[in-house]
Amino acid sequence: MKVTAAFAGLLVTAFAAPVPEPVLVSRSAGINYVQNYNGNLGDFTYDESAGTFSMYWEDGVSSDFVVGLGWTTGSSKAITYSAEYSASGSSSYLAVYGWVNYPQAEYYIVEDYGDYNPCSSATSLGTVYSDGSTYQVCTDTRTNEPSITGTSTFTQYFSVRESTRTSGTVTVANHFNFWAQHGFGNSDFNYQVMAVEAWSGAGSASVTISS
């Protein structure tokens, strides 16, 4: 979840050489997981079979929410999505989001965000180039915080796109391979979703996941 406020839910200047673009291996959408943490803080609707979801939230959001669609078991395969996302003045992310079981880790590939860049307050790991843009990469450690196994200590990994966008293909493997140089397990995946998260301000998102 967010780096600076109280963690909630189950659910970062060295430079790295660009990662060569691999051949994209797309998954069939095959969506089988709905992420709905505190979706009641806004208007969350979804169509799992169509791979679409929407979230609208207003000023006065009292806590953190994470909503989206994806898969019960994550992977390094590419994800293609399109979205309409408006979060100006809101602390919010549009991101590929998920967890690794061991070593336990929470991760984000942030495609667009509102008024808060998580790498502004975390430990920099450098940059990685993927899908037409440089991504800032950073990490943080969460100590005795809620997680997929209850209360635990785990690592967060973030890749934050500099040239933000709201549609495209995310070559997940590029990020996983870079993070793996810094302790990311790159296996034993828990769920993985295309998600919207926010914890302040107002905004809206409509997202379609095609692969």
Curated annotation (Swiss-Prot):
Subcellular locations according to the entry: Secreted
Highest taxon, organism lineage: Eukaryota
EC number: 3.2.1.8
Catalysed conversion reaction: Endohydrolysis of (1->4)-beta-D-xylosidic linkages in xylans
Organism: Aspergillus niger
Description of pH dependence: Optimum pH is 3.0.
GO cellular component, one term: extracellular region
Pathway in which the depicted protein is active: Glycan degradation; xylan degradation
Top-level EC class as recorded in UniProt: hydrolase
Species lineage: Eukaryota, Fungi, Dikarya, Ascomycota, Pezizomycotina
Annotated ranges, domain GH11: 28-210
Keyword Membrane carried by entry: no
Keywords for the protein's UniProt record, in alphabetical order: Carbohydrate metabolism, Disulfide bond, Glycosidase, Hydrolase, Polysaccharide degradation, Secreted, Signal, Xylan degradation
Any Pfam family the entry gives: Glyco_hydro_11
SUPFAM superfamilies associated with the record: Concanavalin A-like lectins/glucanases
GO annotation terms (biological process): xylan catabolic process
Signal peptide (UniProt feature, chain positions): 1-27
GO molecular function: endo-1,4-beta-xylanase activity
UniProt similarity note: Belongs to the glycosyl hydrolase 11 (cellulase G) family.
Function: Endo-1,4-beta-xylanase involved in the hydrolysis of xylan, a major structural heterogeneous polysaccharide found in plant biomass representing the second most abundant polysaccharide in the biosphere, after cellulose.
Catalytic site positions: 106, 197
Protein name as annotated: Endo-1,4-beta-xylanase A
